[in-house]
């Protein structure tokens, strides 16, 4: 084997070697080798490593390989020796047919440099094929009158070899009538012709046997033979004649099968069988005979198989016309195949990278691509491109090779992968294209820091929270992937009130959930400022911080604290002064309280929980100011005890109470005289309170029983008197005065009333007059200190018992008692101001029974409730005895629940005031009652 060079001479050889080395370094030189055909597999072709300037061991390291297109590889690289060897047995006739020289072209790729080196290997022909004829025997007829010199074309032999190994000569067996003349054709092959040397005589010899031998020029010589049988017939003096000596037609390669391409025509002036012309192919290639069909009677030439411009661009054939007597004529037919764009470009990806990091610089090579189109001309010119919206570009190399490179830096967070469509299109009409897809994965690098969902966070936690309670959750996301996006959370250490932040809070490193490590106190601190850090797991790791404001929410965990009046250390109560001349609304004192909580939990409201004289004082709901609700009277006790409750608005509400002692006096000596009485009484123990409750319940039960008995007796008495009035028709001028007792739950005062009933014999109507009593106990609502007008009862109240009290008015809602004003011990009172007293009909009837019982006992002079003459009723049971001279005159109306009558005091009558009439509705008066 040797490398063939075009230049000769030592100097030229050296110059050529130097030029070859430079061309190889630039990747644009051609390397030429030659090898005989039919060489065994693995035969040496050339030292490719030496010609590339590389060492044999560098072939594998630098990725040197053969790049061939569209065929089985004929050659291979021996990585150990660095030589080019045959990959299989090579048949030159299979590769190149009759073409000379037979060149096999391919490229050597140096992958690390992405360089291509074109290589051409010439396949040298050897004499491995024998000349052959298409027919083993040839029979034809000749007229005996054929003139000498007539030429008869003989089939030519075919030898697949080329050069000297191809067919070189023809020989005809000896015969006195025939000789051989070989014509050199214009297109190359030799055409043997048999020449008639002397006239034929059928009677002398009817059949002539000849042998035509075709020999090549190889060593040793190979030859093939054709047996010829010539039958001598009678004379036919007119051979067929074609209308044209040569026929030419252009046919597109995509013509349908069976299309009539051409019609040849030959005529023979003879008659009968001598004038009948038949057509046949003469000396055509077997491939042409497979593609085209010639109708032997009509001369039509059609295609039996598709035409392929890429296989044959021109078909040349000879058509022979023969009459019935054996005379023949020949014509040449040329069929030129026109190329059409029927082949799409072929895209081959020679080398490709499937993954690239996102931080690789622009110009990174992704793939090496080759494009080929089997068409010719513009139909074979191709263009390769990719979509313009991709960060890639195609760079054209030599010999329709392209490389795909990055045009700019990739960003995985925007696009994590690309499906690159490579389109190859030719310039034919219509243009054909081919698409090839390359999938490229962009691998991630840690180039993004974690990002919190908010710029800052605010969290709220109620105080007194349990330890370990979940407070808040922060979340961050990382645009990276896999480990670069795995986030861990931590608190940036800080100091709060001398203690580390980790003593107060902790965070779950995986979920970002904050937990309280201690119970927070709103009164200690109200908010915490901290920073949370999110860090990914990349290399190197990236992090970001966010501010978190943790606000402690107040809970109602502090009761109100009363600042004034301050509790003395000796358990005594302070004394506030109120002159008896004070007008309603006079500011006695002010209860001052604070609450350590905040917001609604620190909103305070004040109310009078208990008072020794209900209705005398009022407390501002929001100010805590203690004011007089009415004018002070002489009968008001010097010492007034008030229990004020202060309550916040938390849930649940908390409260505190304070006891006030108010001294009512106009002069200082009055206060000094009774200074000893202002000492606070000792608190009864639980057993005394229980005893008082038992005694009170027993007393109420006895009074109720007495009330029932008295009520029955009263009803019987009224019924009896009404019968007497109806019978006698007389009149009653008066009735004995009765005594009524008003009960306020604290004291019972004996009150004497007189009333007069006037009746006539002819009329059942009468008028009942209620004069004012000596005094009346007054129950005033905390919400109002207004005086009420008196009520008068019409005679209808005294009518027959059979008439129902349908005109009875409901109790006036202005005379409702707060819970603090209801009868009972002080320990049974509560702060609910929504109820009314009496609560139900039972309580109302019980109170009426107590009043009637007390009145009956006073009228009979046998009352056991009083403490003696001039004393208050029930005083022996419920408290110390006081004379009537010490009891102040309230001059207020006393309303009996369940009745539409009002008891007026006697003072009104003494003052010359007539009782106001009414129908059960009270009239309000804003004027102060004069003494």
UniProtKB/Swiss-Prot annotation:
The highest taxon in the source lineage is Eukaryota
Which stretch is the leader sequence?
A: 1-28
Q: Which residues lie on this side of the membrane: Cytoplasmic?
A: 714-931
Q: Which residues are glycosylated?
A: 265, 419, 545, 685
Q: Which SUPFAM superfamilies match?
A: Cadherin-like (SSF49313)
Got any disulfides in this one, which pairs? Answer: none
Region Disordered, as annotated, extends over 801-840, 901-931
Q: Where are the transmembrane segments?
A: 693-713
InterPro entries the UniProt entry points to: Cadherin-like_dom, Cadherin-like_sf, Cadherin_C, Cadherin_CBD, Cadherin_CS, Cadherin_N, Protocadherin/Cadherin-CA
User: What job does this protein perform?
Assistant: Potential calcium-dependent cell-adhesion protein. May be involved in the establishment and maintenance of specific neuronal connections in the brain.
Q: What is this protein called?
A: Protocadherin gamma-A1
Q: Native species of this protein?
A: Pan troglodytes
Instruction: Report the gene name.
Output: PCDHGA1
